[in-house]
């Protein structure tokens, strides 16, 4: 993702615990025979650094994350295209209310829908205030320790290796701006067998001070380098 919004995003991800169907090729210690997890993670980081466009779904379970304008992120879905283009739909909480807002970021400006009227308005919005899949995924692949490939599973129709590892909470700006260091968290990454795209990342545990220990965040990526049009909203 070397040209995709470098410095544009800053991220957090969330989600429910996942039941995984299908596994194969593991030994008695729960690792996939013949797979070097560290080498696989480096291959994934290198490949993702080259991705120019992708679709993402970001979710969080057992809590929300502060993003911007008083909003608490519940989930987000959208597309990144090129160095400075993004569009997403955000489900969030504003006080006690559940709301949905749209965000569009373009080279010449950014826009957000008014939560009350639904109308688009110009705004100084940087995805770096809450979401960085572009830089964060690559950095995370290189920050984890004690990695092992535990299973071979299907994710969205793709054959992947599930890699489990440990990561310091301070390395998780991918999921939350201001991530506090000092906690060892369980990280999972689903990496393609045929080509090392990262299809899913999941983090268990508190990333920010005061979060619940059972917080789960998940980022799902797809449609790598597929054409997507992002234009000024009307």
Model regions and ranges:
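Subset-of-secretome marker
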Residues: 23-234
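Sec-dependent bacterial lipoprotein signal peptides
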Residues: 1-21
């Amino acid at each position: 993702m070397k040209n995709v919004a470098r410095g544009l995003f800053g991220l957090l991800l969330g989600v429910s615990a996942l039941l995984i169907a299908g596994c194969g090729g593991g030994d008695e210690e729960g690792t996939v025979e013949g797979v070097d997890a560290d080498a696989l993670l480096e291959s994934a980081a290198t490949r993702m650094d080259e991705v120019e466009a992708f679709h993402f779904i970001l979710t969080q379970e057992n809590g929300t994350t502060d993003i911007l304008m008083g909003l608490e992120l519940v989930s987000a879905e959208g597309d990144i295209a090129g160095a400075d283009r993004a569009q997403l739909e955000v489900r969030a909480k504003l006080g006690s209310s559940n709301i949905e807002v749209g965000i569009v970021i373009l080279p010449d400006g950014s826009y957000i829908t008014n939560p009350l009227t639904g109308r688009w308005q110009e705004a100084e919005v940087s995805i770096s205030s809450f979401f960085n899949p572009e830089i964060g995924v690559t950095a995370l692949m290189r920050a984890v320790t004690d990695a092992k490939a535990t299973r071979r599973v299907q994710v969205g129709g793709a054959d992947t290796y599930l890699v489990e590892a440990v990561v310091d909470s301070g390395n998780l700006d991918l999921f939350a701006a201001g991530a506090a260091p000092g906690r060892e968290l369980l990280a999972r990454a689903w990496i393609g067998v045929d080509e090392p795209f990262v299809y899913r990342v999941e983090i268990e545990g508190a990333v920010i001070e005061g979060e619940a220990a059972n917080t789960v965040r998940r980022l799902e990526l797809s449609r790598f380098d597929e054409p997507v049009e992002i234009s000024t909203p009307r």
